[in-house]
């Protein structure tokens, strides 16, 4: 939901995104395509050390299985790296925090208030425990209206304002990652795309609404706004490449956030080999997509089984689940 609030000269702007559609099943590009394009040569390399905080509802959503939560967060982080590649930005997971016992702030459906509280908590507590550039709160709380995310515009590297909140609104990791990328885009000075903005698709990352067949690329407008943010603010923190000791890892295959040996990867670059389909995901086995119709998520309650499409490593949502609810 679009929101642009200013209270005096010091109050930061806030912008969000609304969710209006079903998820698409288009496969995201492989990690081997991430870096080295001519487009990203327009930007100097930047490194964002990110902390993702999962609220208590996220832990309960996964039946208290912290490994499952951690896996989900890394899947989101991997997708973020793909989306920010054209800007020559590498996302490094500086930390994962899971509120396993209770929420450490009062998470409300009022997105602006939750964002404010999360920013204050980050400044007071999180920065004292772990150095990082940005923090995103992932919550199961239904944010007000159609809002699924909110962030401060231009807040990157500010102790209180380098934050965003994202509702865990989809069972497909890249859809949630697209919302988180949108909020990170706001933190990097990007506004919502107007009708004149183009990324080669109907909807870009900074579109005000998540529409059907959403693109996972930033528009020409977003790239210019990002360049303006860099010129005006010169954020020094995101110039430094983080040490490996400052990152967290997970046994999930395909962790492009930190190099790790894997049979699908080139042993030198740890990028997927050219002839392989995938390196991770519930629909990836032996570096290949599983056959269409393979069950990847067993039915629960009145939900139907979800199946692999044969075109993606993701476990796509069964459309019958949406038609019947």
Swiss-Prot record:
Residues 46-242 form the Peptidase M12B domain. SMART domains: DISIN. GO terms for biological process: proteolysis. Residues 1-39, 243-257 form a propeptide. GO terms for cellular component: extracellular region. Its EC number is 3.4.24.-. The active site is at residue 183. The keyword Secreted applies. Residues 250-322 form the Disintegrin domain. Zn(2+) binds at residues 182, 186, 192. GO terms for molecular function: metal ion binding; metalloendopeptidase activity; toxin activity. Disulfide bonds join 197-221, 199-204, 264-287, 278-284, 283-308, 296-315. Keywords: Cell adhesion impairing toxin, Disulfide bond, Hemostasis impairing toxin, Hydrolase, Metal-binding, Metalloprotease, Protease, Pyrrolidone carboxylic acid, Secreted, Toxin, Zinc, Zymogen. A motif (Cell attachment site) lies at residues 300-302. Its main location: secreted. Expressed by the venom gland. It is found in: Secreted. Gene3D superfamilies: Collagenase (Catalytic Domain), Disintegrin domain. Belongs to the venom metalloproteinase (M12B) family. P-II subfamily. P-IIe sub-subfamily. This is Zinc metalloproteinase/disintegrin.
